[in-house]
Structure formats: structure tokens, C-alpha cells
Amino acid sequence: MKIRKSILAGTLAIVLASPLVTNLDKNEAQASTSLPTSNEYQNEKLANELKSLLDELNVNELATGSLNTYYKRTIKISGLKAMYALKSKDFKKMSEAKYQLQKIYNEIDEALKSKY
């Protein structure tokens, strides 16, 4: 009985030491990193939307020339926050900056409509 166990243990040790078994864990599947994840896609989409809102910043800033100084201050502050958020690439900051820019743009439109 002891001889059988020692033969079995020796055979098992030889099989486990063979190159076929030792190379098994080297053939692991690697995840592809070339495709963007859903978070990266959402961040990129939000960054593009924020950039397009920033492109409209100068036009809206010029439109505030005849309005109250509140609009001038608010649009400058919102623009600076949006630029900072784009540099940081933080989703939360970008979404807040986008909301603020859209809000002030709508307020400027309403103020211009009521004035003229």
C-alpha cells in the first residue's frame, strides 16, 4: 500500500514538473485595452458637448453687453469652471459645468427676448 502511494506521488510530481503543465498559466487571456470602456465613452461624449458649449461662450458673452452685470459675471465664472473641468477630466465637474453653462445660456436668451 505504501509503495503504491509513493509511486503515485512520484508520478504526480513528474507530471506537474513537465513543461506542458508549467506553461498553462502563461497562456491566460488578456483583455483588450484598445477599445474604450463605457465610462471613457461617456466622459468623451460629455467633454465634446462641453467643448461645443464653450465654443458658444464668446457669442453669449458679447450678447450680455446690454444686459445686467449679473449675466456678465455669471457667464465668465461658468466659462472658467467649464475650462477647469475639461482639464481635470472629472465626470462630476464636467456635468456640473455643462449644466451651469446651459442654464446661463437659457437665462441670457430669456433676458434678451424680454428686453427686445
From Swiss-Prot:
Q: Where is it located?
A: Secreted
- Where do the segments described as Essential for activity lie? 62-79
Q: Which residues form the signal peptide?
A: 1-31
Keywords from UniProt, A to Z, are: Secreted, Signal, Virulence
* Induction line: Up-regulated by agr and sae loci. Down-regulated by sigma B factor.
- Record-annotated disulphide pairs: none
Q: Which GO terms describe its cellular component?
A: extracellular region
Which branch of life, at top level?
A: Bacteria
Q: Which family does it belong to?
A: Belongs to the SCIN family.
Q: What does this protein do?
A: Involved in countering the first line of host defense mechanisms. Efficiently inhibits opsonization, phagocytosis and killing of S.aureus by human neutrophils. Acts by binding and stabilizing human C3 convertases (C4b2a and C3bBb), leading to their inactivation. The convertases are no longer able to cleave complement C3, therefore preventing further C3b deposition on the bacterial surface and phagocytosis of the bacterium. Also prevents C5a-induced neutrophil responses.
Q: What is this protein called?
A: Staphylococcal complement inhibitor
Originating species? Staphylococcus aureus (strain NCTC 8325 / PS 47)
